[in-house]
Amino acid sequence: MAAALPPAIFLMGPTAAGKTDLALALARVLPCDLISVDSALVYRGMDIGTAKPDKAVLAEFPHALIDIRDPAESYSAAEFRADALAAMAESAARGRIPLLVGGTMLYYKALLEGLADMPSADPVVRAELEARAAVEGWEALHRELAEVDPQSAARIHPNDPQRLTRALEVYRVSGMSMSEHRLRQAAGNPEGGTSASGQLPYTVAQLAIAPAQRQILHERIAQRFQAMLEQGFVEEVEALRSRSDLHAGLPSIRAVGYRQVWEYLDGKLSREEMVERGIIATRQLAKRQFTWLRGWGDLQWLDSLACDNLPRTLKYLESVSILK
């Protein structure tokens, strides 16, 4: 008889939904190790605009995969998968439960399904890229491609939107550049593909938290952005801008909120425009996260405003045999 797989918990949801609060509540009563699933929290020195848990919280409840990269560096879904699997294995080896919390849905997908050798088209990612091109121009997207896949950028002209979109789409969906995919295919190396090795060796309980009404989430997003500004978000971005190795084309600086504050400091936006666009960009991020979650199977939904989320979650975890 095969041994039972160790348990793990995924706590997903849109930005500003209350994921961290519930994760901390669970960590207070369960033998959990927290693992961040957030593409912005990996960066050091980016604390306010990412709503990173403060030092006191991190001292009491350490989170794996927070502050593991400098903002000048990139971090892919493939790197996340390797790092998260290592953190989960370490947690399980101690007889504890890995609790993964965050809103970067591509990372969860990479964990559950592995990384395809060459991904198929993703209409959500493609629509996002085309919408950005309509606002920023294809030159901006070509500069982004040059950051993550300079070999493809050298081959693809900025005025070739079809190939440019595809190259960026491959990177966004798989976490690897198109050039890296081609090298692996040429070498006949299936590592990272969706074979049996891509299956996650855990019994996973998948939770999602969000307000029942979308308008409430929009209000929370606006309130949180204003609170970030009061906490020194602009000054945080000023400190990043003072570094000669950082620029607006880097993945870290393209993070929601940071890009808008950077443009404000560049004189491209007024303060009012910066606030408005920052809030709108955060709402658009939440919409994309909801799009992912709507297509997600086997989710237990929780209302952010409910008073009984902790006992409801514990009861659910017992029902799916995560807790014995």
Curated annotation (Swiss-Prot):
Q: Where does ATP bind?
A: 13-20
Which parts of the sequence bind substrate? 15-20
Record-listed E.C. numbers? 2.5.1.75
- Write out the ranges of the annotated region (Interaction with substrate tRNA): 38-41, 162-166
Name the enzyme group at the top EC level. Answer: transferase
**Role this protein plays:** Catalyzes the transfer of a dimethylallyl group onto the adenine at position 37 in tRNAs that read codons beginning with uridine, leading to the formation of N6-(dimethylallyl)adenosine (i(6)A).
Give the NCBIfam families listed for this entry. Answer: miaA
Q: Which family does it belong to?
A: Belongs to the IPP transferase family.
Tell me the protein's name.
tRNA dimethylallyltransferase
